[in-house]
């Protein structure tokens, strides 16, 4: 056999062996390892679904609509109608887009009217959708600005509703990453069980 043919066969064997090792490692070992780690923390690996009376009502990780003035409202969604998770994504409108500016002004007027505040007092995250369009959190400022509306609609004192907001405010991740947040689903579930 010629030297060129021997080298070609050796390289082909090496390439085939690399393909088999990569297929086994990335197609079997890695997925099984991720699955095993997920089984160690099943509540976190299964989407953090929240159940009430055995029925799933939402996920701590995905925003959803709460129609009615008696509920805290999440950020606006760019994910289709009704927080459609299959349409998750940003609006892709730039900061100088007239469509974005028009949407922000419409949201500002609607939120100000619903919460009974001046348009300049609307929290910034009540005006813009998150990158995914399905953010389950609002800022503590946004939640606090909704307290009066929610308290009046539910017949609760503003102090009681404000205390629920404070109880459900989470600090920065690791103490320094990101901003404090309020999970809207968790807050609304606590609100649901709050006695007037």
Curated annotation (Swiss-Prot):
Subunit structure: The system is composed of three essential subunits: KdpA, KdpB and KdpC.
UniProt membrane topology term: Single-pass membrane protein
Stretch list, region Disordered: 73-93
Function (record text): Part of the high-affinity ATP-driven potassium transport (or Kdp) system, which catalyzes the hydrolysis of ATP coupled with the electrogenic transport of potassium into the cytoplasm. This subunit acts as a catalytic chaperone that increases the ATP-binding affinity of the ATP-hydrolyzing subunit KdpB by the formation of a transient KdpB/KdpC/ATP ternary complex.
Protein's UniProt name: Potassium-transporting ATPase KdpC subunit
InterPro entries given in the database record: KdpC
Subcellular location: Cell membrane
UniProt record similarity statement: Belongs to the KdpC family.
Keywords: ATP-binding, Cell membrane, Ion transport, Membrane, Nucleotide-binding, Potassium, Potassium transport, Transmembrane, Transmembrane helix, Transport
Pfam families: KdpC
Ranges annotated as spanning the membrane: 17-37
Entry coiled-coil feature ranges: none
UniProt GO MF annotations: ATP binding; P-type potassium transmembrane transporter activity
Main location: membrane
NCBIfam families: kdpC, PRK00315.1
HAMAP family reported for this sequence: KdpC (MF_00276)
Organism of provenance: Kineococcus radiotolerans (strain ATCC BAA-149 / DSM 14245 / SRS30216)
One Gene Ontology cellular component: plasma membrane
Keyword Nucleotidyltransferase in annotation: no
């Amino acid at each position: 056999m010629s030297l060129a043919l021997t080298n070609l066969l050796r390289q082909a064997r090496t390439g085939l062996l690399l393909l088999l090792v990569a297929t086994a490692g990335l197609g079997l070992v890695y997925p099984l390892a991720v699955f095993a780690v997920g089984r160690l923390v099943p509540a976190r690996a299964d989407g953090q679904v929240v159940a009430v009376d055995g029925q799933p009502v939402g996920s701590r990780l995905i925003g959803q609509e709460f129609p009615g003035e008696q509920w805290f409202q999440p950020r606006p969604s760019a994910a289709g109608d009704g927080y459609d998770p299959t349409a998750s994504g940003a609006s892709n409108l730039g900061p100088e887009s007239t469509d974005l500016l028009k949407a922000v002004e419409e949201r500002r007027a609607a939120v100000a009217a619903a919460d009974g505040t001046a348009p300049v007092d609307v929290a910034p995250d009540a005006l813009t959708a998150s990158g995914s369009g399905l953010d389950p959190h609002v800022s503590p400022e946004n939640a606090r600005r909704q307290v009066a509306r929610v308290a009046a609609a539910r017949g609760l004192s503003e102090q009681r509703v404000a205390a629920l907001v404070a109880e459900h405010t989470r600090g920065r991740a690791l103490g320094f990453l990101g901003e404090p947040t309020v999970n809207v689903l968790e807050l609304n579930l606590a609100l649901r069980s709050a006695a007037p």
